[in-house]
From Swiss-Prot:
This is UDP-glucuronate 4-epimerase. It is an enzyme of class 5 (isomerase). Its cofactor is NAD(+). Keywords: Isomerase, NAD. Belongs to the NAD(P)-dependent epimerase/dehydratase family. NAD(+) binds at G10, F11, I12, K156. Catalyzes the interconversion of UDP-D-glucuronic acid (UDP-GlcA) and UDP-D-galacturonic acid (UDP-GalA). It comes from Rhizobium rhizogenes (strain K84 / ATCC BAA-868). The active site is at Y152 (proton acceptor). The keyword Isomerase applies.
Amino acid sequence: MRYLITGTAGFIGFHLAKRLLDDGHFVVGFDGMTPYYDVKLKEKRTAILARSNGFKAVTGMLEDKAALDHAAELAEPDVIVHLAAQAGVRYSLENPRSYVDSNLVGSFNVLELARSIQPKHLLLASTSSVYGANEKIPFAESDKADEQMTIYAATKKSMELMAHSYAHLFHIPTTVFRFFTVYGPWGRPDMALFKFVEAIKHDRPIEIYGEGKMSRDFTYIDDLVEGIVKLIGVIPSEENRVVSDTISDTLSKNAPFRIVNIGGGQPVGLMAFVETIEAMLGKRAIRHMLPMQPGDVHNTYAVPDLLVALTGFKPQIEVDAGVRRFVEWYQENY
């Protein structure tokens, strides 16, 4: 098949594009190569993808509709996967406008593109952050998600709502997946695992927020990609509605639209995560304990039942194994 993927120079987009290329598909990657973190890392990812004859890279910002249209002309996509976004909860406190530009205006342009070319399936990346102040644990897709705690989460929730309206109005089969703390090789330098490994290696203190009492449903990148690949083949329709007394399918009654969590449902305490990193590095961290930061939540915890019902797949790579793979990659590259 032919794919247009936004964000292929980013962490998740790179891994998804590589998987699809390895499977023999044609991929056009669209990325703004923004300097939110080291552009050299993005260039290295793109160079790896460019080794495949089935990959074409287009550089452009999501806000630039003409550039996005050009990428679509090259791709002639059967499937669009929209992964590009301004990410990072804490950075959204410093530079909220970039989140509106990328996550709202950019996503609107992707939706307009889908309206124009009518792909077989449109898939969009959202986040567990949309659950916000929801106190019900674990998080199921049908749970209340109306009190976002950051502009990042608010823009992602807004994208979900816009996507539903486009699916309804223009009959675009659409799946939104909510990610849960993705980690692994080639990850972003601003994420906890990368920051902790780098700090411990160089004898710098690590900053542990919430006094270490938080937990996260860490999802290894290969598991996430497997979940996405399987969902690509599950085009939302009444034919695959999940009918169950225990699973609430989010398939809309008014549109070919569905929201699916991609998370393992096995949250890990932050201190246990730190101890795992220490064990892999053979070195104890210098710990700087800090209070909860604005926008943070105490826990994330996915209910993966809908993903399992639709695809037969559940994230399965344990944190110990995932951290080991990241540390091995880091030591080889840094």
